[in-house]
C-alpha cells in the first residue's frame, strides 16, 4: 500500500479510495514505504459498492481485468482528465460486486516467454501494476 501511495503521488493522484479490508495506511511499514507521500494523497476507507453506485454515469471507471483491452492498443483509456482506476487484490482480482461498475476494462499484457502456464508469472504485484497503469494513463 505504501508503494501505491507513493506512486500515486508521483503521478498526481490526489485521492485513493479503499475498501475497509485494505491495509491501514497508518501501519508503520506503509508509512515508511510512502516516503512522505501520505501527506500529499488523501486515503478514504469506505464501502466501494455504495460509493460507485452514487457516482455520475459520466465518470469513466477503468478496471484492470485479465480479459480487458490491452493497455498498449489505441483508445484503451478514456481521454478524460478525471477518472477512477480500480486495482484489484493480487490474489483475487476485482470482485464481481465491483466489476459491474467498470466502463473501461484494461489489461497489462504479459510478454513472458514459455508455452506452459507454469513457465510464466501468473500476475504482477499490484503496486507495480498501478505504476504501469498510471504511467500509460498519463500519456494521454
Identify the role of each PLM range.
Residues 19, 47, 74, 99, ...:
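Amphipathic, positively biased hydrophobic alpha-helical segments used for protein targeting
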Residues 1, 35, 87, 92, ...:
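Short glycine-rich loop/turn motifs that provide flexible caps or phosphate-binding loops at active sites
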Residues 45, 88, 127:
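Active-site-adjacent beta-strand anchor residues
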Residues 1-68:
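RNA substrate-binding interface of SAM-dependent RNA methyltransferases
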Residues 12-15, 38-41, 66, 83-85, ...:
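Short, surface-exposed linear patches
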Residues 27, 32-36, 96-140:
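Structured adenosyl-cofactor binding patch, chiefly the S-adenosyl-L-methionine
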Residues 62-121:
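Active-site/ligand-binding-proximal alpha/beta "capping" segment
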Amino acid at each position: 500500500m505504501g508503494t501505491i501511495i507513493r506512486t500515486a503521488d508521483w503521478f498526481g493522484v490526489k485521492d485513493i479510495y479503499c475498501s475497509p479490508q485494505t491495509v491501514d495506511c497508518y501501519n508503520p511499514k506503509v508509512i515508511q514505504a510512502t516516503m512522505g507521500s501520505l501527506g500529499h494523497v488523501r486515503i478514504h476507507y469506505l464501502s466501494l459498492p455504495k460509493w460507485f453506485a452514487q457516482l455520475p454515469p459520466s465518470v469513466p471507471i477503468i478496471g484492470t481485468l485479465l480479459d480487458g483491452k490491452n493497455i498498449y492498443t489505441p483508445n484503451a483509456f478514456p481521454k478524460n482528465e478525471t477518472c477512477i482506476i480500480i486495482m484489484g487484490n493480487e490474489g483475487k482480482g476485482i470482485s464481481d460486486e465491483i466489476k459491474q461498475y467498470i466502463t473501461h476494462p484494461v489489461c497489462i499484457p504479459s510478454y513472458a516467454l514459455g508455452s506452459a502456464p507454469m513457465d510464466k508469472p501468473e500476475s504482477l504485484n499490484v503496486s507495480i501494476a498501478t505504476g504501469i497503469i498510471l504511467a500509460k494513463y498519463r500519456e494521454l
